[in-house]
A protein has these predicted regions:
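Terminal targeting signals and extreme-terminal segments of soluble enzymes
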Residues: 1-158
Length: 158
């Protein structure tokens, strides 16, 4: 079985309990830096693989401080505080010793509870009746998507 390009993009090598190494992926390269979802995925992957992590992620807030260059990067994870049911994490991505992205996350052991979400599909025509938008930039992760415009002009005030 072949590995999905996203799994390759967030693949990390473990150096120490709190340190991971990865490499940017051309498959998820955006205009000046990697697609934010690939960066967030790699950073969350480091936290999820940490030997002290318990529970599942409840929140993950990522701040991009500067563009990430093509090539290798390091991710450091820090368990800032833990109690019986939750953990608070800090995750930092750096290149050349400079932090370029930082995240805070909360993981928790979920308890069984009642919940109900009511959502309705918006009133739109079938996809095949919508015009295909031309790609803005034919590289990286945008090649994986076909954008269809329901109404208005893309990238213009409607």
């Amino acid at each position: 079985m072949s590995i999905h390009p996203f799994d390759s993009a967030i693949e990390l090598a473990h150096e120490a309990p709190d340190r991971w190494h990865g490499r940017t992926s051309e498959d998820y390269w955006n205009m000046v830096s990697p697609y934010g979802g690939a960066t967030a995925g790699a950073m969350m992957q480091a936290m999820l693989r940490h030997p002290e992590r318990r529970g599942t992620p409840l929140s993950f807030t990522l701040n991009f401080l500067a563009p990430i260059e093509r090539g290798e990067f390091a991710i450091d994870t820090e368990l800032v505080r833990a109690n019986r049911n939750s953990q608070h994490w800090a995750v930092r991505l750096a290149q050349g010793g400079k932090v370029l992205a930082q995240a805070i996350a909360i993981c928790a052991t979920r308890r069984e509870t009642w919940g109900k979400v009511e959502a309705e599909r918006p009133d739109v025509p079938p996809a095949e009746q919508c015009a295909v938008a031309p790609p803005r930039k034919p590289d990286g992760f945008l090649q994986r998507y076909e954008f269809r415009i329901v109404r208005g002009k893309p990238f213009a005030v409607n």
